[in-house]
């Protein structure tokens, strides 16, 4: 049996919202053992928007640096400097996969 793959998502714009919708509809989770463990977004979201009460929500992406309960970081903030660069490099230093 495969271990559960834990995902952290940084940035909930158009693409990030679409990823969340896919998870809420369970279209991905039916075929893969995947769990979203964290979301970082400046956008105000309600727990019901996330599809699960067990997802850690950060309104500051920099707080993902102190969070370790994920295997893959999905970085959707964009840009090659600033916070997006910082969280990607932090994840790579921790041995995490980054998309």
Annotate the PLM regions:
Residues 16-17:
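N-terminal Rossmann-fold NAD(P) dinucleotide-binding loop
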Residues 3-5:
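Nucleotide donor/acceptor-binding cores
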Residues 12:
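Glycine-rich Rossmann-fold phosphate-binding loop(s) that bind the pyrophosphate
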Residues 55-72, 77-80:
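A structured beta-alpha segment of the ubiquitous adenosine-cofactor-binding alpha/beta core
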Residues 86-99:
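Beta-strand-loop-alpha-helix segment that lines the small-molecule cofactor/substrate pocket
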Residues 25-50:
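NAD(P)-binding Rossmann-fold cofactor-contacting core
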Residues 20-23:
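Catalytic-loop region of hydrolases
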Residues 7-9:
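Hydrophobic Val/Ile/Leu positions in short beta-strands of Rossmann-like dinucleotide-binding domains
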């Amino acid at each position: 049996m495969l271990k559960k793959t834990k995902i952290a998502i940084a940035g909930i714009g158009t693409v990030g919202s679409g990823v969340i919708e896919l998870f809420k509809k369970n279209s991905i989770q039916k075929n893969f053992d995947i769990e979203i463990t964290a979301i970082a977004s400046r956008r105000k979201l309600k727990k019901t928007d996330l599809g699960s009460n067990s997802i850690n929500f950060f309104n500051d992406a920099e707080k993902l640096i102190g969070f370790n309960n994920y295997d893959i970081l999905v970085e959707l903030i964009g840009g090659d400097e600033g916070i997006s660069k910082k969280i990607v490099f932090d994840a790579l230093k921790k041995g995490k996969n980054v998309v």
